[in-house]
């Protein structure tokens, strides 16, 4: 998260800010929900473990984590809706040297669902990584029974299915290069503003 530690992105429907210690307690409450853990493939952690996880993410060079906030005024922790993450790794194809960004998004607060906020948050993190980190390949792994996420990535964002793991009951999708250039390549400047996060 060192990569985005001072980045704040303000867009039409949401604001993205780095995951800070002040966010951990609310994040931990979300992760106490068994359904959220199931859909995100997360383990239950104690509050202390959650603080340690936030600290480790903060120091990692291969993770981008933003907390998704509503655009309304008020205390930041009261505006929290979810998070959006990007895990950066080398391509599994030995002939390719490029980095791949694996995207994850969670809109934990019911008041933030069904409004296009998840779609905007994913578009913002992909656009930011494309422009600032030169990542040109993006993928997502979604459990087969997570219909909202499958719809978001496939129908709304244009990801294409590339594989299925029967062991994990998980579908892997990738974002086609032409979609990245045509939509995400220009999304950030047109629909948002990047500020310094303090």
Curated annotation (Swiss-Prot):
It is an enzyme of class 2 (transferase). Keywords: Acyltransferase, Transferase. Its EC number is 2.3.1.-. Residues 34-178 form the N-acetyltransferase domain. PROSITE patterns: GNAT (PS51186). The keyword Oxidoreductase does not apply. Pfam families: Acetyltransf_3. GO terms for molecular function: N-acetyltransferase activity. InterPro entries: Acyl_CoA_acyltransferase, GNAT_dom, NAT9-like. It comes from the Eukaryota. The keyword Cell membrane does not apply. Belongs to the acetyltransferase family. GNAT subfamily. This is N-acetyltransferase 9-like protein. It comes from Caenorhabditis briggsae.
């Amino acid at each position: 998260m060192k990569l985005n530690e001072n980045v704040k992105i303000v867009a039409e429907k949401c604001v993205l800010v780095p995951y800070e210690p002040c966010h951990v307690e609310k994040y931990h409450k979300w992760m106490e929900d068994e359904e959220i853990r199931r859909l995100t493939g997360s383990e239950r952690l104690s509050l202390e473990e959650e603080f340690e996880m936030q600290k480790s993410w903060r120091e990692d060079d291969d993770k981008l984590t933003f907390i998704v906030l509503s655009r309304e005024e008020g205390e930041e922790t009261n505006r929290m809706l979810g998070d959006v993450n990007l895990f950066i790794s080398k391509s599994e194809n030995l002939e390719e040297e490029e980095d791949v960004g694996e995207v994850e998004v969670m809109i934990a607060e019911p008041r933030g669902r069904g409004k296009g906020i998840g779609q905007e948050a994913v578009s913002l993190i992909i656009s930011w990584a494309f422009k600032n980190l030169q990542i040109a390949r993006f993928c997502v792994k979604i459990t087969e029974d997570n219909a909202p996420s499958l719809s978001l990535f496939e129908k709304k964002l244009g990801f294409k299915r590339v594989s299925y793991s029967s062991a994990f009951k998980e579908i892997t999708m990738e974002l086609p290069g032409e979609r990245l250039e045509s939509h995400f390549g220009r999304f950030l400047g047109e629909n948002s503003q990047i500020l310094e996060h303090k």
